[in-house]
Amino acid sequence: MINTVRNTVMAIINKDNNGYITPDEFNLFAKQAQLEIFEQYFYDYTNWVNKRNSRLANDGYSDIQKQISETIDSFSDQATLTYNSGAGAFPAPADSYFVNVLLYGNKEIEYVAQTKIMNLISSNLTTPNVSYPAYYTKEQFFYVYPTTIQTNVSALYVRYPVDPKWTYSVVSGSPIFNQSAGDYQDFELPQSAQNDLVFKILSYAGVNIRENDVVQFAMAGENTEQTKQS
């Protein structure tokens, strides 16, 4: 999909000799566009759930909520966490957007707000143990109790999409798409996001080359796509 998106972007930019963006600039804009759309899925999903709960959306729109949920699920991952003795905690996976569940072996570790963890520890009735562990999170670290738990902890989480990269070979002075390059990376979003990607990248490109017409075209396209999805 990334080559199709780039070809479309370049065709629109070059239509009236508006300017040019380099492959590195395209990749930078592509990364930001993918991240924006990825984060929008969570907002859209919550919005659709609220609409259904408030009976503002009928059952005919349930497929939209399902599609968004499936897209988010495609970024689900699991990782074993490595204890950091200096911090006394487990660092979150480097690519995690948010963590759904922490596990100690096969046991779910209960999340507790940091302000309440000391109350649990101070009581013999509620203090966490290896059968009923607990944790709180702070600055991308998970503090697990009892503190004797330092291994066998894993996270079920939603990861960020991998940064896209349009790779190329230079032929007669021009960059030509090279999908076989070792660092090639397509977008991880579904095909349905292609138009959104084009318009968002165009918006960044228009600002970069200082072409207001390109920015206005991109904004109009984004508004059209948002209307379709609402």
Predicted feature residues:
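Glycine-enriched, solvent-exposed interface loops adjoining structured elements
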Residues: 1-230
